[in-house]
């Protein structure tokens, strides 16, 4: 099996799977090209040492993040005070109970690809009657369908 063009991925059992950090980068870049603002939430990129046991891990609690909070919020200047919360997962990534609870309440969407994220954004644009912008997002998806989405 060939690696998809333009993607840094790892292979497992003959299937290529993008790392979550790569997925987030692709999502951020795609949305930025379409004029959206992306607010990233979550753990720091650096690991910190635990004062009690000495082990290293990604720090989250001290940042004040709610457990289960989405990875990103998407906003657009033409949305007034609205935003879309997206929890990104790899194709094999497990969803935590808190993440699923927020998704079940309609507060976030769990997405496993750029295509899923952009589809959510297009539907949100439709709900706001921003049909021209929704079509712009769909055309972007169509033009880039050969890319690792």
Please give the residue ranges for each predicted region.
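Catalytic phosphate/metal-binding cores of nucleic-acid and nucleotide-processing enzymes, i.e., regions
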Residues: 1-149
């Amino acid at each position: 099996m060939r690696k998809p063009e333009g993607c840094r991925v790892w292979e497992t059992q003959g299937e290529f799977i993008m790392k979550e950090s790569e997925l987030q980068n692709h999502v951020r870049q795609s949305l930025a090209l379409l004029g959206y603002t992306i607010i990233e939430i979550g753990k720091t990129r650096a690991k910190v040492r635990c004062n009690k046991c000495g082990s290293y891990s990604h720090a989250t609690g001290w940042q004040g993040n709610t457990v289960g909070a989405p990875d990103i919020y998407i906003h657009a200047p033409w949305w007034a005070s609205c935003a879309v919360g997206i929890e990104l997962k790899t194709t094999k990534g497990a969803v935590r109970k808190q993440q699923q609870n927020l998704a079940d309440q309609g507060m976030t969407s769990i997405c496993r690809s750029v295509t899923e994220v952009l589809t959510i954004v297009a539907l949100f644009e439709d709900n706001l009657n921003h049909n021209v912008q929704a079509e712009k997002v769909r055309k972007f998806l169509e033009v880039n369908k050969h890319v690792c989405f």
